[in-house]
Swiss-Prot record:
This is Aminomethyltransferase. The keyword Transferase applies. The lineage of its organism: Bacteria, Bacillati, Bacillota, Clostridia, Eubacteriales. Its EC number is 2.1.2.10. GO terms for molecular function: aminomethyltransferase activity; transaminase activity. Signal peptide: none annotated.
Length: 370
């Protein structure tokens, strides 16, 4: 695929039967043995993902904490060393520039993990807002490879090849300089599947050996490589949002039910705070809802949501859920139609199929929260 970027793991995909697609400008595997098989593997056993296309940036210096707080909606002050925080980075109108993870190494040292499709935009946004803050910002994306190992058996398998007790790495905590198969890595108990698991950051030159080592360690348990197809169905079932679907620069965190990650009472100002305070006071005019399709069909991103002949919103993500075995979706609709139990139609091609609003927590997470 001419002109596309590759990750350090590009050479291993075909070994495992990977089918390659263009994703965010990268050659990446959409599936290996089939996305349904891979989806169930992560839900029941453990699966390994190449997520080296994600972006990473280091923010260091005397004002690092203050600067991060200025950029982010969540309360950075609560972060202790070696902890991870999920947050939004918004524009002045409260629209989402990106959702990202903030890793705190020390008071003057933070590590940001950003979405692949937003990598260049995010780094530019961060640098453009440096102002008088005493910080240094470095895009380290090309010097890091990232693997995600997810599923109920992930800890048991990974424990075989690491030099630390993984039970000591609690949910949304991290440990640096962990030896994984003898290679120095950063390991965090984080993920994007709704299952317990780890994200492993390593040197690009170590990625292939780590990939093989992890899959070999989990051979008896049935660990498998997982592609982008299952990554999306897994995150969707767990109601984890995807940038470009559930959020963008015109959608605020409050509209998609993510107010928990917007700390409007923090003393410090952050970009978009005033707009979000105003929106919270006035109330949102649209909301993200879960829905189940009652007629036969599959809802897809962009399909219109219709009530009494009027378009009231659009589907952000929809699938036939592999775990729940029914057609469900997320939709951004006018607020007055967001109540659970509300019936509406989804326009699937030329048909208007019946649907009903349901709780958007489709799947109960099995992450270790303590």
């Amino acid at each position: 695929m001419e002109g596309l970027k590759v990750t350090p793991l590009r050479g291993v995909y075909e070994e495992y039967g990977g089918k390659i697609v263009d994703f965010a400008g990268y050659e990446l595997p959409t599936q290996f043995k089939g996305f349904l098989h891979e989806h169930h593997t992560v839900r029941e056993k453990a699966g390994l993902f190449d997520v080296s296309h994600m972006g990473e940036a280091m923010v260091t210096g005397k004002d690092a904490g203050k600067f991060i707080q200025y950029l982010m909606t969540n309360d950075i002050n609560v972060l202790k060393d070696n902890e991870v925080l999920y947050t939004f980075m918004c524009n002045e109108d409260g629209g989402v520039i990106d959702d990202l993870l903030v890793y705190k190494f020390a008071e003057d040292e933070f590590f940001l993990v950003i979405n692949a499709s937003n990598k260049d935009k995010d780094v530019k946004w961060i640098m453009d807002h440096k102002g008088d803050f005493d910080v240094e910002i470095v895009d380290v994306s090309d010097s890091i490879a990232q693997l995600a190992f997810q599923g109920p058996l992930a800890e048991e398998i990974l424990q075989k090849i690491v030099d630390v007790d993984l039970q000591e790495i609690k949910f949304f905590k991290l440990k640096r300089d962990v030896l994984v198969d003898g290679k120095k890595c950063l390991v965090s108990r984080t993920g994007y599947t709704g299952e317990d698991g780890f994200e492993i950051y390593c040197k690009p030159e170590d990625a292939k050996e780590l990939w093989h080592a992890i899959l070999n360690a989990g051979k008896e348990e049935g660990a498998q490589p997982i592609g982008l197809g299952a990554r999306d169905t897994l995150r969707f079932e767990a109601s984890l949002l995807l940038y470009g679907n559930e959020m963008d620069e015109t959608i605020t965190p409050l509209e998609v039910g993510m107010g928990f990650f917007v700390k409007l009472k923090v003393e410090e100002d952050f970009i978009g705070k005033d707009a979000l305070i105003k929106q919270k006071a006035e109330g949102v005019t649209r909301k993200l809802v879960g829905f189940e399709l009652l007629d036969k069909g599959i809802p897809r991103h962009g399909y219109e949501v219709i009530k009494d002949g009027k378009v009231i919103g659009h589907v952000t993500t929809g699938y036939k859920s592999p775990t729940l075995n029914k057609a469900i979706g997320l939709a951004l609709v006018e607020e007055q139609y967001s109540k659970i139990g509300t019936e509406f139609n989804i326009k699937v091609r030329k048909k208007k199929l019946k649907a009903v609003a349901i709780d958007k927590r489709f799947y109960t997470k099995k992450t270790k929260t303590k």
